[in-house]
Amino acid sequence: MATFHYHYDPLDRLIQTAGIQRFYNQSRMTTEIKGTQRYSVFQQDGRLLAQQRRDRTKDECHLLGTDLQQSVLHAVGADKHHSMAYNAYGHRPVENGLISLLGFNGERADPVTGHYLLGNGYRAFNPVLMRFNSPDSWSPFGRGGINSYGYCGGEPINRVDRNGHFFGLVSLINILKLSLLRNLRTSFQMC
């Protein structure tokens, strides 16, 4: 039976597992290194933009297409377009491909278990069982909610859980920002 070790930094963020090192900018993962391969994710204002993969022989860049919850739906490279799909709780069949480092809700799936380690590794969410593997330390009477194993109060379409403690609504502010940007672009193009 294989044994895997998970290592955390002083801020309780997952930084190393099974030969993989992770680096963060604030609370979001920016780079992952495994052997000679290095993946870097580029973001702006919380929006995923692109991913770069580098190793000794070549560099690959992919532009990422996401939904409002930051789930990566498309990765467009120089020579190929990849599409990804998930069920409501983030499960993605293996044959669906893993071209992007990040996936459902912009989170990294653990390469060993396929679970999403939310809160930078605080708690593992199992998309097949549609629940967390361990209870929330803030439940049942805190902000974690009554069901200490539940994910997003049973409503993963309109809610997102970034830290493994409690969920929030998909930001109405982000929707308004996108609408405002579209209107500004249209107004600017008319000038």
Each model region followed by its residue ranges:
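Beta-turn initiation residues at beta-strand->coil junctions
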Residues: M1, Q16-I20, T31-T36, A50-R56, ...
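A structural detector for short beta-strand units
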Residues: M1-Y6, T17-Y24, T36-F42, K58-L64, ...
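A short glycine-rich beta-turn/N-cap micro-motif
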Residues: A2, Y8-T17, N25-T31, Q44-Q51, ...
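Short turn/helix-capping motifs enriched in Asx and small/polar residues
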Residues: A2-F4, K80-S83, N87-Y89, R123, ...
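A motif-centric feature for acidic-aromatic and gly/ser/thr-rich catalytic loops and repeats
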Residues: C61-G121, V128
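Cationic, amphipathic, low-complexity alpha-helical segments enriched
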Residues: L180-M190
